[in-house]
Amino acid sequence: MLQRLTAALLMLATMTVALPVTGHCDTLGQIKKSAEIRLGYRTDAPPMAFNDESGQPSGYSVELCRRIADAVKEQLKLSSLKVTFVPVTTEERIDAIVNNKADIECGATTMTLSRREKVDFTAMTFLTGGSILSLADSGIDAIANVAGKSVAVVTGTTSQSGLEAYLEKNLIQAKVVEVANRDEAMKRLQAKQVDAFASDQIVLIGLLMQAPDPGAFKLGRDLFSYESYGLVVRRNDADFRLVADRALAQIYRTGQIEQVYAQSFGKAGLRPSELLAAMYAFGALPE
């Protein structure tokens, strides 16, 4: 009897160890219970996410998140839903989702496999690439021109890894200067402490849109990487991600994305690139 009990306990222990940890999340249930959705957003990534002149969250990704919040409200059949904006930095944005400080992150976050070890992403929301910004009189208008010069890049971003890989592959000798954020990079560039600033092209365009004197800068004419953006959500939460993806598909399918794009980038006279237009078309999934 004792032997059979011991064998059964050992088998149970073995089975318990072998069971995978699913870590299922129930963001929709949490939102329904609290009647609140928390939108993490960047304050320093125009035109994707930033605080406007009145201090209100604004930008392309923020607008998409607002519409996803509307879809969540409808899905849960709530009479009202409080939308709370949670500011996050480049360093905090992933952990804010993992640690349940925000339900979705609305910024300029590139989808990568290493990030998917910790979080998940919605369907793609934007396509851009790494480029450089320099002073107008610097003579730098392409990545190759940074040879022998210094380039600022925000620490820990895909722009940093993409730039370093491009420089190594193309045997371009340049000094990569790590900075904490875009504000520091712009200050160093204006003070001529660095020769260029590398970041996602759409973010550099956003900085130019906000600059008092855009003519003082020059945007690089080529890209050193391609970046696909998505909105960050928690892993193992297919139900919430489905609501977000369904909302995005409807926005793409009905042409609402044209309004969102014009609202965010119209002042700069930008039109969606062929790649971005294709992304919208492929993302317009049917019900």
Q: What does each model-found stretch correspond to?
A:
Residues 25-105:
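Extracytoplasmic small-molecule ligand-binding "clamshell" domains
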Residues 32, 158-177, 215-217, 249-287:
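Ligand-binding clefts/hinges and TM-proximal coupling segments of bilobed small-molecule sensing domains
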Residues 38-47, 57-74, 110, 128-182, ...:
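Bilobed "Venus flytrap"/periplasmic-binding protein-like clamshell domains
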Residues 41-45, 86-91, 100-112, 136, ...:
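Beta->alpha turn/N-cap motifs
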Residues 43-44, 126-137, 201, 208-248, ...:
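Periplasmic-binding protein-like
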Residues 59-71, 144, 149-150, 155-157, ...:
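Extended ligand-binding regions for polar small-molecule ligands
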Residues 66, 77-145, 282-286:
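Acidic, polar ligand-binding/catalytic clefts
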Residues 91-92, 106-117, 161-169, 190-191, ...:
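A ligand-binding cleft/hinge motif common to bilobed small-molecule-binding domains
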